Amino acid sequence: VCLVEVVRVAVGRPLLELPAGTLDREESLADAALRELAEETGYRAGRLESVGGFWMSPGILRERMHLFVAGDLVAGPQALEPGEQIRTRHVAWDDAVTMCLDGTIEDAKSVAGILLTDARRRRPPSPSR
C-alpha cells in the first residue's frame, strides 16, 4: 500500500493517509482518483477498481468519499502544489490493516478505506442476482 504522510495543521502533526483529494468540476470520479494518485505519489495506474463510497460525517457535512484501488502502477515524479509537502510510505497490506487497528493510521477516510477493502477482499464473491 502506498500511503502518504501529510502534515495536518488542525492536528498539529503529520498523519498517514491514503492518497486523496477533491473532485474538479466536470471531472469523473475515476479521473480524479487517477489524478490525485499521480500528483501525491507520482504513480500512474494502468488499472482502477471502484470499491465503493461512504459519507464522512452526514450529520453536518455533504462530503462523500469514493474509494478506488489502483493497480499496474508505474512510478513517476510527484506533481505537488506549491507549499505541499507529502512523503510517500510503502507498507505491506497486512501491516496497513494492523496500523488501522492499532491506531497508527488515524485518518478516518484511510481507516475506513483500508478496512472496507480488506473486508471485501476476504469475503467470497456473492452470487449474481
What does each model-identified segment do?
Residues 5, 71, 92-94:
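Residues at the C-termini of beta-strands that transition into short coil/loop
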Residues 10, 14, 25, 50, ...:
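Nudix hydrolase/Nudix homology domain
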Residues 26-71, 78:
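A contiguous pocket-lining binding segment that forms or flanks enzyme active sites
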Residues 1-35, 39, 73, 77-78, ...:
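Conserved Nudix-box catalytic region and its N-terminal flanking loop in Nudix hydrolases
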